[in-house]
């Protein structure tokens, strides 16, 4: 498996040899930031196109097929259209909060995105409390959503924001308990160590039944945190027009739209990292030839392949199940998922204490 830290170390040494170390670090930070923004934009375009095609498939139609080959540049045209849209200033809104909200949502998404271990040696933020930082950074987004609902001075926006706040805060508990269950098995919160410790088997298989239960609960709760169907009550168009982004237009609306898809990818990427081995290839005990071939596939291909597989599962859920009521959503969390997650955590602790895992 190729280690990208060799390249990054060489770049750092080259820069520090021709300029002061502080300036070199500043240039590296700028380049990393530009790369994250570029990857963020590319992933958003791919995910939106994938969503439209998957939606078309489940509804027995073609999806976008006019602009470009197989509709491949339809999303780019939509981006250009959105860039030319006017950002409307509301007369009686709280302008500061109204304008701040989209940036808080997108910044929370960026911070969380920067934690993802794309390949060996290719992590922007890799420290010993990475899982804790990811959970903390992802919680910032709910503040932006609440500000959007309040600052818009619109009853539909406020109701949508309150629904979203209740939903995200509730389901964060199940996400946290599911990840904590796996942290007990993993013994670390550093993402690079989490992936490397799965070289001899992915945690979804090593943790017995509790790991599978944690994976299912994580997918359900992660889907709800992203406000994706069937948990899309905050933007239920039949009753709230567009929820908390009703009054937004132009790139302000675009930021919310981007954040939704990238948050879905982050949920999928974290699932791929913690449960499915991240950038670690598939190894089967006793099949040395097969394992050697798998090692030739670059780590980032494994990472994105697993992440997009989980994204497909999330899209499948959205376009299969009908929308739930807000009371059903909260009942599912507090009466079922939280108790099951807590019992599951205790079972995992017992498995680890008595050494019953693989």
From Swiss-Prot:
Pfam families documented for this protein: NADHdh
Topology with respect to the bilayer: Multi-pass membrane protein
One of the record's GO molecular function terms: quinone binding
Predominant subcellular localization, coarse grouping: membrane
Stretches that traverse the bilayer: 30-50, 96-116, 129-149, 168-188, 201-221, 265-285, 297-317, 336-356
GO BP, sorted A to Z: aerobic respiration
Disulfide bonds: none
PROSITE patterns xrefs: COMPLEX1_ND1_2
InterPro entries: NADH_UbQ_OxRdtase_su1/FPO (IPR001694), NADH_UbQ_OxRdtase_su1_CS (IPR018086)
This protein's record includes keyword Translocase: yes
Protein name as catalogued: NADH-quinone oxidoreductase subunit H
Subcellular location: Cell inner membrane
Enzyme Commission identifier(s): 7.1.1.-
Designated gene of the protein: nuoH
Organism of provenance: Bacteroides fragilis (strain ATCC 25285 / DSM 2151 / CCUG 4856 / JCM 11019 / LMG 10263 / NCTC 9343 / Onslow / VPI 2553 / EN-2)
Signal peptide annotation: none
Catalytic activity: a quinone + NADH + 5 H(+)(in) = a quinol + NAD(+) + 4 H(+)(out)
Quaternary structure annotation from Swiss-Prot or TrEMBL: NDH-1 is composed of 14 different subunits. Subunits NuoA, H, J, K, L, M, N constitute the membrane sector of the complex.
């Amino acid at each position: 498996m190729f280690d990208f830290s060799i390249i990054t170390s060489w770049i750092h040494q080259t820069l520090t040899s021709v300029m002061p170390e502080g300036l070199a670090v500043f240039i590296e930070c700028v380049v990393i930031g530009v790369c994250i923004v570029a990857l963020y934009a590319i992933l958003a375009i791919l995910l939106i196109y994938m969503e439209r095609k998957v939606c078309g498939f489940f509804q027995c139609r073609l999806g976008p097929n006019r602009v470009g080959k197989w509709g491949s540049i339809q999303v780019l045209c939509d981006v250009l259209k959105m860039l030319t849209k006017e950002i409307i200033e509301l007369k009686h809104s709280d302008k500061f909060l109204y304008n701040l909200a989209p940036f808080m949502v997108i910044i929370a998404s960026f911070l969380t995105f920067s934690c993802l271990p794309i390949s060996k040696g290719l992590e922007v933020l890799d420290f010993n409390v990475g899982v804790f930082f990811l959970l903390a950074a992802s919680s910032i987004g709910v503040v932006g959503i609440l500000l959007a609902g309040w600052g818009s001075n619109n009853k539909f926006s406020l109701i949508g924001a309150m629904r979203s706040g209740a939903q995200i805060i509730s389901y964060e508990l199940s996400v946290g308990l599911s990840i904590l269950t796996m942290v007990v098995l993993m013994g670390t919160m550093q993402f690079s160590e989490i992936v490397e410790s799965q070289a001899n088997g992915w945690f979804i298989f090593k943790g017995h039944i509790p790991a599978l239960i944690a994976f299912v609960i994580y997918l359900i709760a992660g889907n709800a945190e992203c406000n994706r169907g069937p948990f899309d009550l905050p933007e239920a168009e039949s009753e709230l027009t567009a929820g908390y982004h009703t009054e937004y237009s132009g790139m302000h609306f675009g930021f919310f739209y981007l954040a939704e898809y990238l948050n879905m990818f982050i949920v999928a990427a974290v699932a791929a990292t913690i449960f499915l081995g991240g950038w670690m290839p598939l190894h089967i005990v006793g099949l040395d030839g097969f394992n050697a071939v798998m090692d030739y596939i670059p780590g980032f291909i494994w990472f994105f392949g697993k992440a997009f597989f989980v994204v497909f599962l999330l899209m499948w859920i959205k376009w299969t199940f009908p929308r739930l009521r807000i009371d059903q959503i909260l009942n599912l969390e507090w009466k079922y998922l939280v108790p099951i997650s807590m019992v599951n955590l205790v079972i995992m602790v017992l498995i680890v204490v008595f050494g019953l895992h693989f």
